[in-house]
A protein has these predicted regions:
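Non-heme Fe(II)-dependent double-stranded beta-helix
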Residues: 1-17, 23-124
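Short, conserved beta-strand element in jelly-roll/cupin
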Residues: 117-138
Length: 138
């Protein structure tokens, strides 16, 4: 973390202690509406057997194929949040569009960290952070 500027220490501490922070209304309504339209269209074009196969986890589409999501990935207000907590060099690794059916079981987050042999894997500072945007009420 950079020491030469003001850091949102409260949010950073919350991230370390709880594992998450909530930042409401990061996206503009215009971008949010565009993403909602595109993701809704993508999810409605999936074959029924695809939806049946992933009934409990929901649909998971890679965000890598959708140009509109590049704007979301590079969204300046979101990157400013990271910078405000001292994460100055954010990079993008991967992204998913997840669509779950109402009343389906809740999901758990799981990621197999690829760098357990690196000493930084055991430091308090997170090695990876992700943004999760809810496009509809849950």
């Amino acid at each position: 973390m950079k020491k030469d500027r003001t850091v949102d220490q409260e949010r950073y501490d919350q991230l370390l202690s709880l594992g998450y922070c909530v930042f409401p209304q990061v996206l503009s309504e215009e971008l949010l509406d565009a993403i909602r339209c595109q993701t809704e269209a993508l999810c409605t074009t999936l074959p029924a057997e695809e939806n049946d196969r992933h009934r409990s986890q929901g649909t998971m589409l890679s965000a890598m194929s959708f140009p509109l999501l590049a704007e979301l990935i590079a969204w300046r207000p979101a990157l400013a949040i990271l910078e405000g907590m001292g994460f100055d060099h954010a990079t993008f690794t991967d992204g998913y569009i997840i669509s779950k059916f109402p009343q389906s079981p809740r999901l758990f987050w799981h990621y197999d960290w690829f760098a357990w042999s690196d000493p930084s894997a055991y430091a308090p500072k997170p090695q990876q952070i992700f943004f999760m945007y809810y496009l509809s009420d849950t």
